[in-house]
């Protein structure tokens, strides 16, 4: 004899867009400006200006499930990811091929003091990081994280 068990299964469906749009090669950019200070305090949320150019032949969408956003990774001195999923910074509007955009990146600093590499990257949400499609498309800068001055 067996016991009948009832449970609910849920699923979410997200429309990502038309196949042609999803296949568009948006994964090309040029970092034009924005450099963090060489030292930051641990466990902080900081803002930093950045400028990027869309060097692809497709428009970067600023909205929708597969929007393009700027982000970052924190790496250790050996280049291994310590924090891979950095905060996203939304584009203020769609960026046409050849267009540039200036925005404020929001960056959460690591909790643990030490020497890190801050790697700036971009991603197309739900699909891919630019660095996964175009290795070498990131900018890496050394940053020392000092102990927090919180009491």
Task: Name every feature range the model reports, one short phrase each.
Residues 1-6, 60-62, 126-138:
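Beta-sandwich strand segments
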Residues 10-41:
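Low-complexity, acidic Ser/Thr/Pro/Gly-rich terminal tails and inter-domain linkers that flank the onset
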Residues 30-31, 73-91:
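Short beta-strand and strand-turn-strand segments in soluble, beta-rich domains
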Residues 50, 116-127:
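Internal, hydrophobic beta-strand segments that form the core of beta-sheet-rich folds
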Residues 52-56:
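Asparagine-centered strand-capping/turn motif at beta-strand->loop junctions
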Residues 62-69:
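Short coil-to-beta strand junction motifs in C2/discoidin
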Residues 90-101:
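Short proline/glycine- and polar residue-rich coil/turn motifs
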Residues 106-114:
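Short, surface-exposed loop/turn segments at beta-strand-coil junctions that are enriched for proline
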